Amino acid sequence: MNVVVLGELCEDILMHNPNSVEVFEQKIWAKDVTVTAGGSAVYVSQALSRMGVDVRLCAVVGDDESGKRMLRDLQAFPVDCSMVRMLPNSDTTRSIVICDGPEKDFKGCSPMLPLYIPDIEDLGGAELLYVAGYVLYPELWTAEARDLLKKAKERGITVALDVQMFPVEGIDQLEFSHLEGVLPYVDIFFAARKEMLGLLKTEDPAGCMKLLQEMGFRGTAVFKQGGKGCVVATGGELVRRPGCTVEAYDTVGSGDIFGASYCYGAMSGWDSRRCADYAAVFTALSIGEYHDVKNYPAKEAVEAVLSTID
């Protein structure tokens, strides 16, 4: 399986379990602070790589030490970074998040670098093009990006798109992102509950699917519901699957990991129920305690849990 992942690459600064370590019988320190390669496209790429997929990451970093270090770490994972551009005289985007069990508190992000849109020939050999964080990048709202997805679909490349949300309130993100222009070329569409509400003004999966179809969408929509699982909509059929109960340490990137593992199943020819169950288990096993890099599970560990699910 060969995949190109297009989207966000940043340096994540993650504080885990604040005020959990005691000093003089008072809980003062955080358990740890982790600095790691992050961003939607990175979590998707790492998860797919751990599943044995050949992954090419298409993203942008600055030419600072953070950017260089992240590329070294990703290449060692391994993730193919030959499509990552390093912008001269630029600082790599950094994001700060506080993680307290299943809760995550996004504190801020430095300016995002402009994303470049690859040429269709750059996708040579790809079976899947995964767009990670569509609404986050104005470059993805352009005719150039729309044409890339159109050409990819014409060449038989499966197109997956995780919509996400721009961190700005009071604007119509559906309108300014021109989502309706790309939906006809998308095979697998992902949205979390806040994105369903923010973009489509409803959390009802059937209602969301109806609106997507009115905009030309003809694929499979996966509505992510966190620990509660997901709802998969294909045509007029809805499949509801539960999540997995685990003790979460860090849920940053969990939606991206879910999308990656769902696509792994879809590209393997599985039905929507098995795809959803595999994604739920793989994600649950990825959000436990770790050091430096998430503990993405081996496929054998996922299959062992899947064998217990009805």
PLM region spans:
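Glycine-rich phosphate/adenosyl-contacting loop at the front of the ribokinase-like
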Residues: 1-60, 65-72, 76, 249
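Structural motif
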Residues: 2, 127-128, 188, 220
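Conserved phosphate-binding/catalytic region of the ribokinase-like
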Residues: 3, 150-154, 201, 205-310
